[in-house]
């Protein structure tokens, strides 16, 4: 009996001889939906022949996933590695082809590709998974986590100081961090401001000079998010204490209908409230929240006749004890009197207590991989805000595909949370 081996384009070996890691690499690229890439690549193909088309985007995914440092090194690896050629359609482009790709697509084109990967993840139920720890009556929608990452720029950063004391660099889109950093000291670079879901899927990343405050970017970041994903509904956004201002609390809820869960600094409440922010009844007993009215923008508290359980008798009679309603005396707090103290997610509310630990857990997990996602390797010398933005979006695309692949392979919903109940 004669056996024939059909050669696969780009693959110089028998597929049966591949190692488990190599087969996993092939399976990863087999799960990439071509409809996430091809329509965008074809739209931005230019006036000449389409050439490599979507294959160049796949090559960029190879670069990020395999941690290849430069376009030149990527072009060399595509020529030498048959697995890389196989998953990219047997292409062997020069390093200039990737520069042309960035100029043609720009941040807008790469953003469109990332949007399609996010839509794919949404179709699999990865953006808004069930989290059993959260209250069932919470506001429905996707829970967001905001964070920023400092990116060191290693190329063309030689600076000159003018007479006013301002620094000017070869790349005018970079700046000093603005203050001493615990790790990078006074390095020069950009800052990546990102929003991701509570399950870890990155949704949007915007770049700014390193000295721009997170507070100055967060509203614009949410505005871009809502405009980019108009078919999605967002409910909460978890932020660290650096965002804890009355204006941010107010604007996020009033302009976007999203409840900000911000790690609070110490607050002092007015007369009539205890130190934890609970209102007191006229006889000094602590009241408990009963319902949050999002339409009327107020929270209703009730005493639930707690004085009946008190061992100390009241000095004056309480008329609410005789009422048939179990809630007893009621009182309202209004969002307009201060979103930090009386808003929809105050520190003593159940949703705040449940979401706060997720912020800590996600930050610790992503803190270990931030440099793997966005860190500007020393041999990467991207210049200009557009090229650095593309660099960050490429990492977001790969991270989104990583989460999709893990789910299709093992059913794992999130890389940062244990949601496989």
Description of each model-found segment:
Residues 46-50, 60-68, 88, 208, ...:
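Short, charged/polar micro-motifs that form catalytic or ligand-binding hotspots
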Residues 49, 76, 107-254, 263-265:
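Polybasic low-complexity intrinsically disordered regions
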């Amino acid at each position: 009996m004669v056996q024939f081996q059909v050669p696969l384009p780009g693959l110089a070996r028998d597929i049966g001889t591949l190692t488990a890691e190599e087969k996993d690499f092939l399976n990863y690229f087999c799960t990439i939906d071509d409809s996430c890439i091809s329509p965008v690549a074809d739209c931005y193909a230019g006036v000449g022949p389409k050439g490599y088309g979507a294959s160049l985007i796949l090559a960029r995914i190879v670069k990020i996933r395999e941690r290849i440092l430069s376009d030149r090194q990527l072009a060399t690896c595509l020529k030498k590695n048959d697995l890389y050629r196989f998953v990219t359609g047997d292409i062997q482009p020069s390093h200039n082809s990737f520069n042309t790709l960035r100029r043609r697509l720009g941040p807008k084109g790469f953003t469109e590709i990332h949007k399609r990967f996010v839509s794919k993840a949404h179709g699999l139920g990865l953006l808004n998974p069930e989290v059993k720890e959260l209250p069932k009556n919470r506001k429905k929608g996707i829970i967001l986590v905001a964070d920023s990452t400092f990116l060191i720029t290693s190329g063309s950063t030689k600076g000159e100081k003018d007479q006013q004391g301002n620094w000017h660099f070869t790349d005018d889109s970079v700046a000093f961090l603005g203050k001493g950093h615990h790790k990078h000291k006074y390095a020069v670079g950009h800052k990546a401001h990102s929003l991701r879901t509570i399950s870890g899927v990155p949704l949007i990343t915007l770049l700014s000079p390193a000295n721009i405050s997170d507070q100055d970017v967060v509203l614009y970041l949410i505005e871009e998010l809502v405009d980019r994903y108009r078919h999605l509904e967002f409910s909460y956004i978890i932020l660290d204490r650096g965002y804890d201002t009355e204006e941010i609390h107010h604007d996020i809820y009033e302009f976007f209908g999203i409840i900000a869960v911000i790690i609070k600094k110490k607050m002092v409440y007015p007369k009539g409230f205890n130190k934890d922010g609970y209102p007191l009844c006229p006889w000094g007993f602590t009241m408990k929240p009963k319902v949050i009215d999002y339409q009327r923008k107020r929270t209703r508290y009730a005493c639930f006749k707690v004085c009946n359980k008190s061992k100390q008798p009241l000095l004056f009679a309480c008329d609410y004890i005789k009422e048939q309603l179990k809630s007893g005396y009621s009182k309202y707090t209004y969002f307009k009197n201060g979103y930090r103290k009386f808003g929809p997610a105050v520190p003593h509310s159940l949703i705040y207590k449940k979401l706060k630990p997720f912020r800590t857990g996600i930050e610790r997990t992503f803190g270990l991989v931030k440099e793997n996602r966005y860190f500007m390797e020393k041999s990467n010398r991207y210049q200009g805000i557009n090229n650095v933005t593309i660099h960050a979006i490429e990492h977001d695309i790969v991270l989104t595909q990583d989460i999709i692949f893990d789910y299709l392979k093992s059913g794992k919903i999130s890389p940062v949370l244990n949601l496989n109940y």
